[in-house]
Amino acid sequence: MQADFVIIGSGSAGSALAYRLSEDGRNSVIVLEFGGSDVGPFIQMPAALAWPMSMNRYNWGYLSEPEPNLNNRRITAPRGKVIGGSSSINGMVYVRGHSEDFNRWEELGAQGWAYADVLPYYKRMEHSHGGEEGWRGTDGPLHVQRGPVKNPLFHAFIEAGKEAGFEVTEDYNGSKQEGFGLMEQTTWRGRRWSAASAYLRPALKRPNVELIRCFARKIVIENGRATGVEIERGGRIEVVKANREVIVSASSFNSPKLLMLSGIGPAAHLKEMGIDVKVDRPGVGQNLQDHMEFYFQQVSTKPVSLYSWLPWFWQGVAGAQWLFFKRGLGISNQFESCAFLRSAPGVKQPDIQYHFLPVAISYDGKAAAKSHGFQVHVGYNLSKSRGNVSLRSSDPKADPVIRFNYMSHPEDWEKFRHCVRLTREIFGQKAFDLYRGPEIQPGEKVQTDEEIDGFLREHLESAYHPCGTCKMGAKDDPMAVVDPETRVIGVDGLRVADSSIFPHITYGNLNAPSIMTGEKSADHILGRQPLARSNQEPWINPRWAVSDR
């Protein structure tokens, strides 16, 4: 088995790479994927988003090591084990990120990845329905749209933000991210529109693209060059040969794991694991970043939430409506309004994100109270805490060791306390007078810094946005793993292209920037001239230095 390009992973970036690298028909591509089919209602029905993440069939099911600042809880760290990777099990929320995120990337050594450089790739990949004209793509493979927005609670949330003095944005993925607005989702015609739907399936219709179901054990490196991938399938170990390059797109947990198993990483750690050191790159597995969030839940005094649909019978009705007619509650992920806010005067870009949900519920679908309710998922998105990923052993099938080191920076506590108090201010606005009942969580007795900190230690969870473990940077940066053209430093014929190469976490959900990374990396791999830089200037709040709104 051989191809010009061998891609490890069919997720957000890997699928985009397969599509673009094979586009002109001159290059052969093999995609290696361990996970199975993404066909079925648990994945394809947007409202069923909680199901695939809870199923071992679709999820690698990783857990962090005990987190010392979170009562030593082991935090769930899901990654997609299915065609389409995590884009097939995620919440389908589409957020490009803020312009300052990508300008920061360039400042950190990722030359050519500033906002002006990446905006054309966002436009190339998007098929936006109703986005801001001139700022959005309209004929790309990735369908992006808003939900039906039929529930009055969505509108109450946006109106409450206006009453509190915050900005409103008509398109947070356009020129102006900051403010309250309607949330976008990667759905189309009532179905999840994953990277597999947008990129991989069209690519697999080409004669020069092949998908191989297998377990990738390590990258084969000969005389300083990646020549293939050692795989296991059907109980046999084989090698898939790469005539040109191997591209690792296996997630922020498995991409560094594969590099280390192949002898690329911190020399001392590799020796400890009994692995021959091919290239000493101390940054492999370091710089792990993530977003955290908690659920702020409130009783609704009016029977307008989704609570009535939680009994099994009504879930079955919603499922049948979706299955046979592609209509009803099943066609949306139910995250249909949102906010992107700045935490304080002097903060230039939004750093607090809200997902609003018209029901008070846990992620597994259980009601938080025996009543109608509503909630926000809220978190501080620019944490300075950093973790790492390392090997548990030299066994390729052993789970990686994941240490997030959540809440290890003092500023995180200050910002999350502010999130609690700010949410109370928003839910206290006149727009919620018709609906506001008792506070379910954190609870009205949780008021002091100490009480809020206690709540956070027990209830903060991952937003499932890990990144940064194969950092992109300048070649002379000792902690960089790949250069700005996504080439692994010190090895020929090997690249990494997924969220693991982000030098710094972006503001918002990571599916969109991960796909963009695949799109842009494809041009680097093919030696093409990058798309022309944009000269569009995004909106920055003129009051940012003196006001938080």
From Swiss-Prot:
CC annotations in GO: plasma membrane
GO molecular function: betaine-aldehyde dehydrogenase (NAD+) activity; choline dehydrogenase activity; flavin adenine dinucleotide binding
Transmembrane domains' residue ranges: none
Chief location: membrane
Gene Ontology BP term (one): glycine betaine biosynthetic process from choline
Cofactor dependency: FAD
Cell membrane as UniProt keyword: yes
Annotated residues for binding of FAD: 4-33
Active site positions, chain numbering: H465
Keywords: Cell membrane, FAD, Flavoprotein, Membrane, NAD, Oxidoreductase
Function: Involved in the biosynthesis of the osmoprotectant glycine betaine. Catalyzes the oxidation of choline to betaine aldehyde and betaine aldehyde to glycine betaine at the same rate.
Name of the protein described by the UniProt record: Oxygen-dependent choline dehydrogenase
Gene: betA
